[in-house]
């Protein structure tokens, strides 16, 4: 208020002086117009900045705030997934020792229909079909869709979100992980083929798995929900090819193909990265998953 009064008095004094000097009146009006214009634009830019900040806060407040569970750090036994051969015959990879670092947290639940819709509504994620209500897991997403969602969530939260590596998913799954290795000692390839056929038939018994609301398939010993339920979950692990030594104890990975990624669930499946429904095609290796979804891990930065 005092500032406005002082400015008014100043302008009145200036105007009185200008009346006595008409030749300077035009210069005064030009200067006054410039000052008013500058103040107007300053006000407009300040208002725009406030609106931008409010919009960012709104997006962050409506973004997913997932419950998290810490993946136990430490050393554990892990069997790599891929196409491996010994003496040119298909075989399973041996167990390897892997280490999980500290500070990695995984979503307690898969990304839901509501969570994914927030990204779509923000104009960042691809529109995909959804089944059921907001508290159902989002399905019908490709690996590429999941990566875009992780990038969006990282951007709006300022945190690092990504798909889990397969060994991280296995560690988090605990007793819910299904090791689909074919334990057979015979060197006859037909024996392995028959064993794989029986395993596939057992995995395909019954109808399509039922989609349930979040938590509908229960929790594992770590408190993580819906692992190995109806939804197969994308990992960032690429398709691997390799050979085993004659004794079968050492694995040499010869190549990786990252146009195909590993999905984990009731069994392992390698799926082409742009596929959203593997039931109609696109499963590169293994039985096709019933539904494709995902959950993310958050990497802490110390």
What are these regions (language model features)?
Residues 2-51, 55, 219-220, 254-302:
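Disulfide-stabilized, aromatic/cysteine-rich ligand-recognition loop
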Residues 71, 76-78, 106, 116, ...:
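Bulky hydrophobic/aromatic "packing anchor" residues in well-ordered structure
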Residues 96, 126-133, 276-281:
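Short glycine/proline-rich turn/loop motifs
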Residues 62-127, 137-144, 229:
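A short glycine-rich, aromatic-capped structural motif
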Residues 132, 143-278:
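Functional-site microenvironments in short loops/helix caps that host divalent-cation chemistry
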Residues 66-68, 73, 101-103, 158, ...:
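Extracellular structured ligand-interaction cores
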Residues 51-65:
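Membrane-interface motif at the C-terminal end of an N-terminal transmembrane signal
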Residues 95-96, 213-216, 284-288:
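Short Gly/Pro-enriched turn/cap motifs at secondary-structure boundaries
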């Amino acid at each position: 208020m005092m500032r406005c009064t002082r400015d008014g008095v100043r302008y009145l004094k200036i105007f009185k002086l200008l009346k006595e000097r008409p030749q300077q009146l035009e210069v005064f009006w030009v200067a006054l117009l410039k000052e008013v214009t500058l103040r107007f634009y300053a006000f407009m830019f300040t208002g725009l900045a406030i609106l931008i900040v409010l919009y960012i806060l709104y997006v962050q407040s409506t973004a997913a705030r997932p419950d998290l569970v810490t993946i136990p750090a430490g050393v554990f036994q892990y069997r790599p997934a891929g196409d491996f051969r010994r003496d040119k015959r298909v075989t399973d990879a041996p167990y390897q020792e892997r280490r999980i670092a500290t500070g990695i947290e995984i979503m307690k639940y898969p990304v839901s229909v509501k969570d994914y819709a927030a990204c779509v509504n923000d104009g960042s994620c691809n529109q995909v079909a959804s089944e059921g209500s907001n508290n159902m897991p989002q399905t019908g997403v490709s690996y590429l869709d999941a990566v875009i969602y992780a990038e969006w969530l990282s951007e709006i939260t300022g945190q690092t979100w990504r798909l889990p590596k397969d060994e991280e998913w296995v560690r988090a799954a605990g007793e819910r992980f299904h090791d689909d290795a074919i334990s057979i000692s015979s060197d006859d390839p037909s024996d392995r083929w028959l064993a794989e056929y029986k395993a596939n038939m057992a995995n395909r018994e019954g109808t399509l798995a039922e989609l349930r609301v979040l938590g509908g398939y229960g929790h594992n010993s770590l408190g993580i929900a819906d692992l190995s339920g109806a939804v197969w979950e994308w990992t960032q692990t690429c398709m691997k090819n390799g050979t085993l030594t004659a004794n079968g104890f050492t694995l040499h990975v010869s190549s990786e193909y990252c146009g195909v990624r590993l999905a984990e669930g009731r069994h392992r499946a390698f799926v082409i990265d742009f596929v959203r429904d593997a039931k109609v095609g696109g499963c590169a290796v293994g039985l096709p998953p019933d539904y494709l979804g995902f959950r993310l891990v958050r990497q802490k930065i110390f």
